């Protein structure tokens, strides 16, 4: 199983394109773990609009980018973990 761990904070500008670029490369048995650091824009709504069972989101209060990545990693279940910043668009073949 692959876990892609993403840290977000007010990432509404790129989040949809980014999630699409990741989901197109992972299997149904893989996961996208998103840790949101207290976004106050539409990031959460855009993530939830996917209705994809591979996506798990953890939304909390603002801490720091490091804490945010650690939070995503601690919730990951995969044997292999990829990290993704909130504005990364994954080109084909990354996974």
Model-derived features: positions:
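Acidic donor-binding/catalytic loop of UDP-sugar-dependent glycosyltransferases
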Residues: 42, 88-95
């Amino acid at each position: 199983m692959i876990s892609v761990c993403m840290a977000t904070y007010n990432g509404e500008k790129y989040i949809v394109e980014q999630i699409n670029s990741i989901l197109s490369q992972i299997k149904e048995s893989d996961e996208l773990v998103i840790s949101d650091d207290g976004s106050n824009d539409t990031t959460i709504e855009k993530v939830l609009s996917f209705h994809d069972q591979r996506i798990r989101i953890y939304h909390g209060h603002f801490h720091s980018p490091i804490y945010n990545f650690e939070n995503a990693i601690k919730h990951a279940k995969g044997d292999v973990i990829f990290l993704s910043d909130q504005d990364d668009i994954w080109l084909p073949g990354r996974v």
